[in-house]
Swiss-Prot record:
Reaction catalysed by this enzyme: L-aspartate + O2 = iminosuccinate + H2O2
Role played: Catalyzes the oxidation of L-aspartate to iminoaspartate, the first step in the de novo biosynthesis of NAD(+).
Active site: 288
Key words of the record: Cytoplasm, FAD, Flavoprotein, Nucleotide-binding, Oxidoreductase, Pyridine nucleotide biosynthesis
Protein name, UniProt field: L-aspartate oxidase
GO cellular component: cytoplasm
Cofactor note text: Binds 1 FAD per subunit.
Pfam families, alphabetized: FAD_binding_2, Succ_DH_flav_C
PANTHER family: L-ASPARTATE OXIDASE (PTHR42716), L-ASPARTATE OXIDASE, CHLOROPLASTIC (PTHR42716:SF2)
Enzyme Commission number(s): 1.4.3.16
Amino acid sequence: MLTDHFRPQSFNGIDDIVIVGGGLAGLFCALKLAPRPVTILAAAPIGYGASSAWAQGGIAAAMSKGDTFEKHVADTVAAGAGIVDEKMTRMMVAEGPARIHDLLEFGVPFDRDLEGKLLLSREAAHSERRIVRVKGDMAGKSIMEALIAAVRNTPSIRVIEGYVVEELVREGRFISGVIARPDAGQSKSRVSFPARAVVLCSGGVGHLYAVTTNPWEACGQGVGMAARAGAIIADPEFVQFHPTAIDIGKDPAPLATEALRGDGATLINSEGRRFMLDIHPDGELAPRDIVSRGVFAEVQAGRGAFLDCTKAVGRHFPEMFPTVYASCMAAGIDPVRQPIPVTPAVHYHMGGVLTDGEGRTSIDGLWAAGEVTSTGVHGANRLASNSLLEAVVFAARIAENIKGSLPAPKLTAWGDNAGENDDPVTVEDSPPFKVLRQLMSDCVGVVRTRESLTRAIRGIAELERTNKRLRFANIATTAKLIAIAALQRTESRGGHFRADCPDERPEWRRRTYLTLAQAERLAAEVAESEPA
């Protein structure tokens, strides 16, 4: 599907800038690049395949009278478990308020009080109320609706929907374009898009796992593509599990937003006991990794875990949290009167393609923003509502960097050019992908061990050996990077927990940097070793 103002066949000539992905980072970057000509390639209609549109909490920004940049930085560093890049974090936090004002100018209807001031809420591990929201739990949807309208009204932005990017084209040290498959990845032909600059905004890795809150499109293709092109990947072992996905057997799992606990909702087991009080002094508002392990332990013990909102929210649930309310009622659960069954689900990837403060990757010609990246601002455990902030801050910085480093083209030509052919694959329906998802959940999940990680690496290698299609190779590459980095990190920190190494170790108070070549060598060593 294409925007109304452009109907291409296939493409020739050179695009000025190609953005891969139609989520928050991609759309915001395109808008900040205007009037530079930009082509957005999106696997699904923009907004529909993006985790951004599903975000319920909001965007964190230090804007209230009692808040400061220093407090926001301190909270981010504390949540990140010792490996946050403080310089990058200070930059992100300082630019947050300006990006909120950009979003207001693009038409985002953030909640306001009777005097017109922005309403700010508090979420887990934040010391102040600094989350800007829309209608309680509709921030992501409302932000994306506003940006989509702005993009479709910007003549310099061309949106091509239903094109799945499968490969970054590298010529020497440079990325010179991308190759994509039309018809939502189902076409037998592929199309090349040469470009002067490529911005990767392809999202996260949630659907590498059997239980996730992410849309189907978030299956790790972007990280795998970049790694296969030679990019450095950082911190891939750090996967954040949201502790309160609604446990009703849906895929993806609906999310019970962090804001519910911020407003006083409690976590109980089937015996009615608030188990988080025994685990952390902040109880339900402890960092996500700690709450996730607490919920996981109750579920594994057979006691179950439930989010009790009956007293904290009660009859105000429908208007305060309409998205969560609708998900519960559709499953026959009335959250006004009943506790909500919850389970940990993959929600966010702190790791990804390594970028600097301008969004540049380790390969010339390739920038990246959003969840596909690892900027260092999240460390080992992302602070709630910092992800949308990171997306807009670094998307804007990429736009400024490209404007300053690439002179505007005099002419952009479009024509016909059929790409290389290959057999398409519907990733979400393929048996190998289902096997991979279960393998990752079982062996590289909330709790990991040397034995489970070794089993995962061997299982991934077998799946790669028997499945040669390019899209699967990208996805399996990302899974392998996560598992290898998790095996190498012989400690527990943030979103990475090893039952056989349950404590933090000072020698591991550092980030992980990994190339695909290094991961392949380590995987070969695992394959040759004795079974764990």
